[in-house]
Amino acid sequence: LDRRRRRPAKELAGRLLAPAFLGGLFLASVAGASALAALGDAPIRGMLWVARTADPARALGSVPTECLKIPADPALAARIEVGRAAFRTAVLLGGQAGRAGINCETCHRNGRTNPDFLFPGISGAPGTADVTNSLFSTHRGNGIDDPKPIPDLAGPKSKLKISQVPAEKKLEPFIHGLITEEFDGPEPTPAVLDGLAAYVRALDPAACPAMARQPLGVGLLMADVRRAMRAAQAQAASGDAATAVVMVASARSRLGLIDERYAAPALARPRAALRDADRRLAEAQGALREHRADAPELLKAWLARSGPLEVELNAGQKASLFNPALLSQAVRRRLPG
């Protein structure tokens, strides 16, 4: 076991957490500059935690297929959708991890593992993470470098650390500790915590598609956006505005993953449409927080306009960093060693 003392958390934080989010989207700070120049040498934030040895087309241009078993029970399926959306937003974790743009899916891509994850000061070999690092946690930091392999949450349940048997109720406190202690995150709403446990339990190796990976593109991310927004609608209808706000945050996070790949000057029009869509989501979040009567209508209206938005984004996808050739050019600029 490598028990080297690690670098101080503040030293790492200053270098890794400098880029800022505005309106839920990762925005270039230099107006009018080209995509690569505006975002320095890491136009896609995920490049900051991908090993230099990784195949960019696989690590940044595709994702593992999701092994999610959707139950016949509509109530349980709705809980799973809440957890699925929360799993994909940095708002859940908060703290330094949230400010770095990290969420559960950063390490567990589509609920799986991430063999290419290499976060400076947190990882040892690619695909490992030190969950007791004081950069992310003031509660569990132990001052010792001890990264462990990232588990595949869709692997055999018997190989996972915590029992997922619902009657044993071991998974919920474990996830709560991960959020509030391991990542210094805010207290999750009861529905979010319950949903996360339901989502993790629904990840099943028997539900894995025949195709191991799928291309990452506008269609996949917009599907995630709509699922999160439908979960927001359901939570708002039930009177749980706080959980609905988290669902909208997840939708905004997925739009952000599209936005950062549309930074080329030629994509100004679809990028403007993205920013307008994000502005309308921010308005819906505000309405939910204020318990305004127009919140449900704002959510409904956003979903109604999501189809034309996707059409416009698809039209520009070949000129974006979803294009494997352009992605490879961008990646050659920088990957951490």
Model-identified regions with their sequence ranges:
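Periplasmic c-type cytochrome electron-transfer domains
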Residues: 4-6, 32-337
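Bacterial N-terminal signal peptides that target proteins for export
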Residues: 5-21
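Sensor of tandemly repeated, compositionally biased sequence architecture
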Residues: 11, 31-32
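Bacterial N-terminal signal peptides
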Residues: 18-31
